[in-house]
Amino acid sequence: MNRFFNRELSWLAFNTRVLNEAKDESLPLLERLKFLAIYDTNLDEFYMIRVAGLKQLYEHKIASKGIDGASPEEQLEKIKHYLAHEIEERELEFQKIQALLFKKGLCITPYNELNLEQKAKAKTYFKEQLYALVLPFKLDSSHTFPPLANLTFALFARIKDKETQIISYALIKLPSFIFRFVELEKGLFVLAEEIVEAHLEELFLEHEILDCMAFRVTCDADIAITEDEAHDYADLMSKSLRKRNQGEIVRLQTQKGSQELLKTLLASLRSFQTHSYKKHKLTGMHIYKSAIMLNLGDLWELVNHSDFKALKSPNFTPKIHPHFNENDLFKSIEKQDLLLFHPYESFEPVIDLIEQAASDPATLSIKMTLYRVGKHSPIVKALIEAASKIQVSVLVELKARFDEESNLHWAKALERAGALVVYGVFKLKVHAKMLLITKKTDNQLRHFTHLSTGNYNPLSAKVYTDVSFFSAKNEIANDIIKLFHSLLTSSATNSALETLFMAPKQIKPKIIELIQNEMNHQQEGYIILKANALVDSEIIEWLYQASQKGVKIDLIIRGICCLKPQVKGLSENIRVYSIVGKYLEHARIYYFKHENIYFSSADLMPRNLERRVELLIPATNPKIAHKLLHILEIQLKDTLKRYELNSKGRYIKVSNPNDPLNSQDYFEKQALKTF
């Protein structure tokens, strides 16, 4: 018997749970639409990275197998088989929601169903907003198929010259920055590509449009960087980003159009060359023909529309923790260690802390790591302001996938402001989230530390659940000072801390030691691990051994879980759960009954434990330990948004009509009640 679930199929099962939220009829319609958008965006990234990686292994005949022993070719086939039915489910769900939205006055209307007045408005919109932006290409001997960047959205048409009757083909690129949903009248939307298609004869004069189809390509978007050869890491990353759009096509999505047109499109894709003059390899490319609009990720335009509040979930306003109501946040932290649970407790104190430090003459230095900060960052702006007055040192991780460009921009801005900027660490990704502020008061140095499971990003802090920790304890500050020094001197691989634990050297051995300690207590042992993913085979094997010793183990794993629970003789004392709700579960909390409770930036994956700089923080304060355990206990009682994984790999929704509990709603209400 195989002891592990396949990683890729486990991820797909997570995305299925996201799709299930779109099917939840108790949710407002635009909330359901939001989950369809998330589903598609997730799947885009899965193809750009995971499927692209498997395709590379297969094409280069690299003998690499998944944790379950499946070859790249087998995994690609399993992925295609898994998605074949689910893509149809997604389309049906969109059509159901679309029909319900129509009844509520939000109409996504096909162009051919518009009346004459509405078509006249569409024509005006085409002339004023689209005509100058679309890129039409007639494909002939002097105009070959142009390069297609990752996530290119385009139309492919068969056209006939009215004079010569010669049939040829045309490509019309639609830029990503145009509005996809064009509101012709209040509540009446038409897709931009349908407006363009209806006016193709204005782009190809003296031609008749015979057939047309919309299509979208997904390409390999992983960035390969040879760090050994890097003299200027920022410059190397900048050049690598420019190559991202030149990756091989891994997926083709098409909408309507004849089979003949699809065959011609495929032949055209096979013949064209990229900027690097390497032909695209379409071997094993996944092709999906859609009955609905392509790229449901663009549904965010409707979800965020200001006119349909009645169709959305009410906005929750994060509450300010009462200990942070004082004007001087540093005094609050000196009084006691504090732990916030975002988004229920506001992220604002984190921003305020940096802003207060920047304006306080007593502040000597600010040290910080930045992983994903977003395009508009008040935190970076505060650091830029501080850099003109005090010592500011920032490690900006340029290898944060899909945030590389934003991080590079902020790193350059910080450098221009006078901050010391470090661009990551050689062969390691810095994923630890930490802030250290040093002040001088009463002729003494005082250190203030903030550590978090989530990013320094106010926007994600409103939709991700994370915990963040504030402390003025010297033993914690000393470890963070040591860690920052190791990052600046590129010695993080071999560094070890005293109070905290860091990867790649300490976290995995510590977690194994904690599991072994619970094994010593056999049936009295109890472990709860809450993480985004559980993939590390060594940790899974130790959990199996603990189960066989009688230790009760509850795992709350939001996404990928390669461990097989409830298998007789192997894991019958292990139960695996997953919570998917309106907030993305992101906090990592690790509880060991006979030792302590910890929170961490690290998931239980080889990449986090062996190839990243991460932190594991023990909750030595009883109040904080109790708060963390309470989070776990409530989530284990969730009967509305919790799934249980069975031994066959299926996720079954937990239900108890007599005791309905949505853990995320519970924490919202608790925040309102407490504050």
Swiss-Prot record:
This enzyme catalyses: [phosphate](n) + ATP = [phosphate](n+1) + ADP
Q: Which Pfam families match?
A: PP_kinase, PP_kinase_C, PP_kinase_C_1, PP_kinase_N
Q: Which UniProt keywords apply?
A: ATP-binding, Kinase, Magnesium, Metal-binding, Nucleotide-binding, Phosphoprotein, Transferase
**Broad EC category:** transferase
> Which coenzyme or cofactor does it need?
Mg(2+)
CDD domains named in the record? PLDc_PaPPK1_C1_like (cd09165), PLDc_PaPPK1_C2_like (cd09168)
SUPFAM superfamilies assigned:
Phospholipase D/nuclease, PHP14-like, PPK N-terminal domain-like
Entry annotated with the keyword Amino-acid biosynthesis: no
So where does ATP get bound?
A: N42, Y464, R558, H586
Listed EC numbers: 2.7.4.1
Q: Which NCBIfam families does the record associate with it?
A: poly_P_kin, PRK05443.2-2, PRK05443.3-4
Q: List, alphabetically, the HAMAP family matched.
A: Polyphosphate_kinase
The identity of this protein, by name, is Polyphosphate kinase
